[in-house]
Amino acid sequence: MFSLRPTALVSLSVVLFSIQETLSEQQPFVSPGWSDQWWHKSELESYTFPWPIQKVAIIGAGPSGLAAYHELDKAGYDVYLFERDTVPGGNWHYTDETPVKEPIPNADVSIGDFVPSLPPEGVRLPYEEHYEGNVSDELLRAHRGPKPIWNSLQTNAPPPLQQFRDHPWPADQPWLLPHAVLGKYIRAFASFNGINSNDVENPHISYNTRVELVEKCFTSTENGPMRTGWTLTLKQVSRTGTNTSKAVWTKENFDAVVVATGRFNAPYIPNILGLKAWADRFPDRIVHSRQFRRPQLYTNQTVLVVGAAASGVEIATDIAPNARAVYLSIRPRRISNSNSAGNPLSSRWMGRLPHNVSVVPEIKRFLPPTSAIALSSVELTNGTILTGIESIIFATGFRYTFPFLPQFHNTSLTNHDLEHKPKPIVTDGTHLRNLFLDILSIEEPTLGFMCMNIEIQNFKYAEYIAVALSKIWGNKATIPPVTRLWELNERRVMEKGGYGKYFQFLGFRGEREMIRLFTGWLNDAAASHGGRQVR
């Protein structure tokens, strides 16, 4: 998702290297695990939805949410879009404002992004509350959730790989784009579809609106309550004056729900021995990478960056010209020429690090803090003691979390637990479980998910998922019955060696295999049930 600092020569070499590394057939291939051509089975074995699907809610207006809206709207569904931020764009909406400071140690993954805010029990909806002063400002910030990108961020893939098919870039675009340019492109696509934040005439879009809860909806019948979809509890927060705001809670029912909230919402900071004492003693000097905005904040400092995936390498490189020195702490297995599941810090990457960036081993522990952070010590796994550290940035990634779906969280399970009822989607936050093709809840097939895989081109991949959901819910493409879905899921888990951090990893080859699967399945369905072909 992210690229290196905006120096033309370095950036071009990084993109060329990135593409070469991505396309390299030397890189081990991790199968997506969905190799069975289940769509060739008889229609008698297909899943039947218990209610017709017409009204669909989409949670999130990033690229994948917009792609879902575009496709479902085109297919004739009544589509409603809910976005907690002020404008569309997802992670590509940059602001100088930073997210609310993350706790150390991590919050429980079920509330890793936010703690759902529900109206008082028993009140009539819509229900309002009013705020002023600092309370108002903090409410607005926490509600919209500023995104984890920084001022100098650029894309790490050429425009043709980061575009909506119906909205191509001009041919003369440079290979690397500043985040502001991509943000404008996404907003232009939203405007073209009448779903930008200023399209006030569209009653189906709601910005500044966070989905607090998604729960089963029941309708009273002669035979008792009958399940008919989903009820969403919504909270819209808006500014009413210079330092005042109000929150309005409502509820609305839908036949199906698309989760398009992305993967970069709940920060992960490893629970290293002694870290909490440092965080308590020096709270402003220890942050997650999502707080990083500008390198000037670290001028003449000695900075410890933890993590060797994309953000860690890029932030270390970005702050190096301003900093006195930078330590980049990595795990030994990250120094390799190939890695099937992530962004390796290969010898070629290391050769591009500035002279004042030193690569050091993993942190073993933080020794008891003293009166000043620079006088305190960090012990590495090889026994080295670092002192003089003035700031620490944890570029250690994010965890999957859906606070609005508490019924699908179970943090008590281990990575290798397979049997549990109800079947959770989120456990420890490193991966997702019990999703067919990683896009559809097996237990609740009216609950869809957009672009939850690792190492994919979101713009392109989102369009295939959107078409799949549209056809499945419109009975123009079939899926197996639930018993068969569970069989396929269990076989996939075994093929991938159990659950773990890279369970959702695809990469170039895995994404290509999944696109072949989507294309074969959906075009086979189009031949049987009608509808357009995908390519």
Curated annotation (Swiss-Prot):
Q: What class of enzyme is it?
A: oxidoreductase
Could you list this entry's UniProt keywords, alphabetically sorted. Answer: FAD, Flavoprotein, Glycoprotein, Monooxygenase, NADP, Oxidoreductase, Signal
Q: Establish whether keyword Transmembrane is in the entry.
A: no
Pfam families in UniProt? FMO-like, NAD_binding_8
Q: Which Gene3D superfamilies match?
A: FAD/NAD(P)-binding domain
Give the family from UniProt: Belongs to the FMO family.
Please give the pathway this protein is involved in: Secondary metabolite biosynthesis
Its name, as the record gives it, is: Flavin-containing monooxygenase iboF
| Binding residues for NADP(+) | G307, A308, A309, A310, S311, G312
Q: Which residues are glycosylated?
A: N134, N243, N300, N356, N382, N410
Q: InterPro entries from the entry? A: FAD/NAD-bd_sf, Flavin_mOase-like, FMO-like
Tell me, what is one Gene Ontology molecular-function annotation carried by this entry?
NADP binding
Report the SUPFAM superfamilies cross-referenced here.
FAD/NAD(P)-binding domain
**Residues annotated for FAD binding in this entry:** G60, A61, G62, P63, S64, G65
Signal peptide range: 1-24
Q: What does this protein do?
A: Flavin-containing monooxygenase; part of the gene cluster that mediates the biosynthesis of the psychoactive metabolites ibotenic acid and muscimol. The first committed step is glutamate hydroxylation by the 2-oxoglutarate-dependent dioxygenase iboH, and the last step is decarboxylation of ibotenic acid to muscimol by the decarboxylase iboD. The order of the intermediate reactions is somewhat ambiguous. IboA likely activates the carboxylic acid at position 5 to introduce an amide bond, and the flavin monooxygenase iboF generates the N-O bond. There are several options for the latter step.
Query: What induces its synthesis?
Result: Expression is highly induced during artificial growth in symbiosis with Populus, which is close to its natural condition.
Is Signal found in the keyword set?
A: yes
Query: Which Enzyme Commission number(s) are listed?
Result: 1.8.-.-
Cofactor(s) in the UniProt record = FAD
